[in-house]
Amino acid sequence: MKIRSQVGMVLNLDKCIGCHTCSVTCKNVWSSREGMEYAWFNNVETKPGIGYPKNWEDQDQWQGGWIRGISGKLTPRLGNRVSVLSKIFANPVLPAIDDYYEPFTYDYQHLHNAPEGKYLPTARPRSLISGERMDKISWGPNWEVLLGGEFEKRARDRNFEAMQKEMYGQFENTFMMYLPRLCEHCLNPSCVATCPSGAIYKREEDGIVLIDQDKCRGWRMCISGCPYKKIYFNWKSGKSEKCIFCYPRIESGQPTVCSETCVGRIRYLGVLLYDADRIEEAASTEHETDLYERQCEVFLNPNDPAVIEEALKQGIPHNVIEAAQKSPVYKLAMDWKLALPLHPEYRTLPMVWYVPPLSPIQSVADAGGLPSNGNILPAVESLRIPVQYLANLLSAGDTGPVLRALKRMMAMRHYKRSQTVEGVTDTRAIEEVDLSVEQVEEMYRYLAIANYEDRFVIPTSHRELAEDAFPERNGCGFTFGDGCHGSDTKFNLFNSRRIDAIDVSGVRKHGEGE
């Protein structure tokens, strides 16, 4: 048994209001710079929809994640080593800029400089790539927000597989939910396996997946290898970049920027202990519907004396074990079985999990318009958001875990409503879903009224175990380019002119200001 610790995240989709605060703050802190204008390490999608980049869930097109061979051995869907190297100079499944969107700004200066005329001047869009004016903005990272666009395009959502999706195009049957997305910091990351330069690594102390900017050579195989498409190419520096899980904040015991600024308080951060020796076996499970349960078996109980003893022997700090015992992520994912992984069928064993949404369902149930099958709780299988859709998103098509999570959340609400409104303690609903009164009270505290220290339980890092960086910090500093010498190197493998900054406020062409 090889015990490792991982800082994981759970997002409660039942409380997400789609305000995009997490996206904006993450963008301002980490990717609001040249070469990364199109990149959003955190973005919020409206489901159903094809997402950002377009159709990112279609692995038949993008070849991300792992595939299980006949022998039971895992191979990147992109191909083995020989296959990856054979297309290193021309990757046929690399997303183009049009699959993301053409980043743009507006010609605000024209509002001040426009000559006096008959009509008010307007701020027209201008490309941040070419510097030219754009006739029309046709796509963006949140283009489908609030079900924007016609259903015919949103119906290409891969989560509609094995469903009669035509009926959900009708107004009476339509539904929506928000899905905040960031790098999953997987236990079995396919981006690490597909990088020819070996520049991507997973930190042992907290499981955060990072890209070594000095080793990265810009082959961009990691972009194709990542099934969640959360690695981006910086065209200015010629390097790949991704969400770093705000590791400078994590090291000091602070939550990530997206978690800190979340308006709905939907995010939970905590430590999980896992057995690294079980990863290959879990990811190689034959049936995709079993992957969720197999991943749960990888996690270790932090309250087990045998696990604690072995963890201390293997060098896991005591404060990390204490944090794992108080982890809200472990409670939501393992104790109560409410949180589920995003697309476990990719076999990467993701570590950012989601609580399925119940709010749009519960309002219908309260109206008494749903069958209850003779039980206290209504039949969640017949509610507005299709259970099969949520299962395709969160449990590889297996509706069992989704039904269990939804029923337990509904039972908690039924119990608390009878307690606060009717003044009685009705335990029939929670008994149906195998929950005790103590568990439900704790669930209510964490899901509804959790304090800051309940949602974020992050141990500080042990600097005494790290190498002394004093000789490096004065000469290197913090850069986003080619190591210590910034991003102005003239070296180019293909002997072509390097792309430099484009001044989008340059002199307008004749007739543009009219």
Please name every model-derived segment:
Residues M1-E514:
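Non-ligating segments of multi-cofactor redox enzymes
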